[in-house]
Swiss-Prot record:
SUPFAM superfamilies per record: Ribulose-phoshate binding barrel
Organism annotation: Staphylococcus haemolyticus (strain JCSC1435)
Catalytic activity entry: N-(5-phospho-beta-D-ribosyl)anthranilate = 1-(2-carboxyphenylamino)-1-deoxy-D-ribulose 5-phosphate
PANTHER family with a match to the protein in the record: N-(5'-PHOSPHORIBOSYL)ANTHRANILATE ISOMERASE
Pathway where it operates: Amino-acid biosynthesis; L-tryptophan biosynthesis; L-tryptophan from chorismate: step 3/5
Keywords on record: Amino-acid biosynthesis, Aromatic amino acid biosynthesis, Isomerase, Tryptophan biosynthesis
Protein name: N-(5'-phosphoribosyl)anthranilate isomerase
Gene3D superfamilies reported for this sequence: Aldolase class I
One GO biological process term: L-tryptophan biosynthetic process
Gene name in the database record: trpF
Length: 208
């Protein structure tokens, strides 16, 4: 399964993650987030990670100009859109940045299947998260049974306060998810905790 650890903020965190058996690391570029990093910070931290780990920048309603600036100035290879981006915008993104993976976060609502169908031709991976009036993660869970209608043709990760106990619950539902996007539950006092990360990896992948 795919594991994405999101909200990396420091060199210490990046170095602790570098040897771990995970697939994606998220850097947040959104000033309203407590995990916000500027472009130079993202550049430095993204270059500490091996090529086998996707380096994802998380953005909210960005411009194409901002995305181009980040791509040119950092070592990221994936964009995660966490706002109200339109299909036309994503088409432009795909046209301009052919080698960049595009990830779209969507809220888990009764309309989730329709929402995914609108975007799926242009998106490499979806992240299904808890609905919120604010942009970004909430650390709260949602009704995972909403995802039972998503078949294997839809590549998606589950987010929203995911921890080891919730992973165990989700696995009993036999969903078609590819993995998990995790942030707050692998932190202690606001910093990524290596022991908590290893516990999640052991649960999801069965090996460290």
């Amino acid at each position: 399964m795919i594991l994405k650890f999101c909200g990396i903020k420091t060199k210490v965190e990046a170095l602790s993650i570098r040897p771990l058996n995970i697939n994606m690391v998220g850097f947040i570029h959104y000033p309203k987030s407590k995990r916000h990093l500027d472009i130079e910070q993202i550049n430095k931290l993204s270059r500490l990670l091996p090529d086998e780990i996707d380096r994802v920048v998380v953005l909210v309603n960005p411009t194409l100009q901002l995305i181009k600036k980040i791509i040119n100035a950092t070592n990221i290879n994936a964009i995660q859109l966490h706002g109200d981006e339109t299909i036309d915008f994503i088409k432009q993104l795909r046209l301009n940045f052919k080698n960049i993976k595009i990830i779209k976060a969507l809220p888990a609502t009764q309309n989730i299947i329709n929402d995914i169908n609108q975007f799926k031709e242009h998106i490499d991976l979806f992240i299904i998260d808890t609905p919120s009036e604010q942009y970004g993660g909430t650390g709260q869970s949602f009704d995972w049974t909403l995802l039972k209608g998503l078949d294997q043709s839809i590549p998606f990760l589950i987010a929203g306060g995911i921890d080891v106990d919730k992973i165990k619950q989700i696995e009993t539902l036999k969903l078609n998810h590819l993995g998990y996007d995790i942030s707050s539950s692998i932190e202690t006092d606001g910093m990524k905790d290596k022991n908590k990360m290893l516990t999640v990896i052991q649960q999801v992948k069965g090996e460290l």
